[in-house]
Design a protein with these regions (language model features):
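Single, function-defining residue in the core of a domain
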Residues: 1-55, 63, 68, 72, ...
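Short Lys/Arg-enriched helix C-cap and helix-to-coil transition segments
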Residues: 87-100
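Conserved beta-strand elements of the Class I
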Residues: 110-112
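Extracytosolic and intramembrane catalytic regions of membrane-associated proteins
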Residues: 132
Length: 414
């Protein structure tokens, strides 16, 4: 059996066992929950949630306890879940992801993409922040917004932040994930429309990250203090100075007004210039536009060097962003995140982070899969659906050579 798979499994399970040694840190009622001897201890509970699939909780319990007559009931399982804080799985996700050693980079950068995706849950009106009422012909539902940073080269999620429908904010989520990122390598971030805010640029620059972000309006003629050329393709440099004061207020206080000055309105969030601040913030970037094969054009903003990343390179680079869209689909349908086993917010959060852990575990398993095995005239890749299934069974205790199975089910690259 492959040593890497064994090591990954032992790393994950040892983290769960270590968390079980301090149940009060993850219990809703510390000192009372998880103190009595039960069949469903904290480590067993986390293990069961982690390996749940679309089958009912009762069937999962029967499988774990090998069809014993004293198998805990589904009701007992739910009662134990309600004692566990979602923070347990969030911490497990971060610890396990930090333990991984991805090797692939893009020109020396960790190539990340940021995006958000909605997750629909059963109706639970008690949670007003996520509840959306239906109509006379349709029941209401609850909606969660999942924000994530995804490593496009290595196929793993590096961070996740879950928000509720009525309190969501992708800009705020991005800034929070950037600020708390533990990545030590240079980072290059790709993002779609909606992330082109000054505050986002500033947080990225403060961390020393590079970015390539699509602008909201591809046909716009004015952006970030400059008039854009009336051309299907261009590459220009912009440099503006941001401030909170009006030009009159700056004159009254004896502050010289820069030529490329842009005032930020009080309702525009910018963490480095609080409302009323007299400080200035200089922002510079490249704005590029290129034509697509269908004749349309896209406009992007970046702080990448023009010599290292000319216009054709940016066009190819931005196309890589689609990888995070594919990953969300795999997360929901291959890993099975859409098969929620509860409608309560705390239990849904448990399952969301469990799905991300299983996703990263499955991807890390595939890193050493030999895709050149056998004879084929096509380039091939691992069947991720098979990888998830085998990883889940491997975590459940199956003694299998995962990589031998994966070699037999390679798919041609389309």
């Amino acid at each position: 059996m492959n040593r890497t798979a064994e090591r990954l499994r032992e790393t994950l399970l040892s983290m769960i066992r270590k968390m079980g040694e301090h149940p009060k840190d993850y219990a809703k009622n510390p000192g009372r929950d998880f103190t009595r001897r039960r069949s469903l201890t904290l480590p067993i509970l986390m293990y069961l949630i982690l390996t749940m699939d679309e089958k009912s909780a009762w069937k999962g319990l029967l499988g774990y306890f090998q069809n014993r007559i004293d198998t805990p009931s589904a009701s007992a399982f739910v009662q134990q879940r309600q004692k566990l804080l979602p923070r347990a799985f969030e911490e497990l996700f971060r610890c396990f992801t930090d333990s991984l050693r991805p090797e692939k980079t893009f020109h020396g950068y960790r190539l990340l993409a940021v995006d958000g995706s909605s997750l629909k849950a059963m109706s639970y009106p008690e949670d007003a922040d996520s509840y959306r009422p239906g109509t006379e012909l349709q029941h209401g539902w609850n909606l969660y917004h999942i924000n994530a940073l995804y490593d496009l080269e290595n196929g793993i999620y590096t961070d996740v932040l879950v928000q509720k429908e009525h309190t969501k904010g992708e800009d705020k989520a991005l800034c929070e994930m950037v600020d708390r990122a533990s990545l030590s390598e240079p980072v290059l971030l790709l993002a779609d429309r909606g992330y082109e805010a000054y505050n986002n640029f500033a947080h990225l620059e403060q961390r020393g990250w590079k970015y390539l972000i699509r602008l909201r309006d591809r046909d716009r003629t004015y952006a970030y203090g400059v008039t854009l050329p009336d051309s299907p393709e261009f590459d220009i440099q912009v440099c503006i100075t941001l401030g909170r004061l009006t030009k009159r207020q700056m004159g009254q206080q004896g502050i010289s007004v820069p030529e490329s000055y842009c005032r930020l309105l009080p309702n525009v969030p910018f963490d480095f210039l609080p409302p009323g601040s007299t400080d200035l913030y200089t922002f510079s970037a490249r704005i590029v536009r290129f034509k697509l094969e269908n004749g349309a054009s896209e406009t992007l903003i970046t702080n990448l060097d023009a010599e290292q990343f000319p216009l054709p390179a940016l066009k190819q680079l931005y196309a890589r962003r689609w990888g995070i869209e594919t990953s969300f689909r795999q997360l929901k349908y291959t890993v099975g995140l859409i098969h929620l086993h509860s409608k309560k917010p705390e239990l849904i959060l448990q399952q969301i982070f469990s799905a991300f852990i299983l996703y990263n575990f499955s991807q890390a398993i595939t890193w050493e899969a030999d895709t050149t095995w056998g004879h084929s005239k096509y380039r091939r890749h691992v069947n991720f659906s098979d990888a998830v299934y085998l990883s889940c069974q491997f975590l459940r205790g199956w003694s299998i050579d995962i990589h031998a199975f994966l070699r037999r089910t390679l798919l041609p690259c389309r």
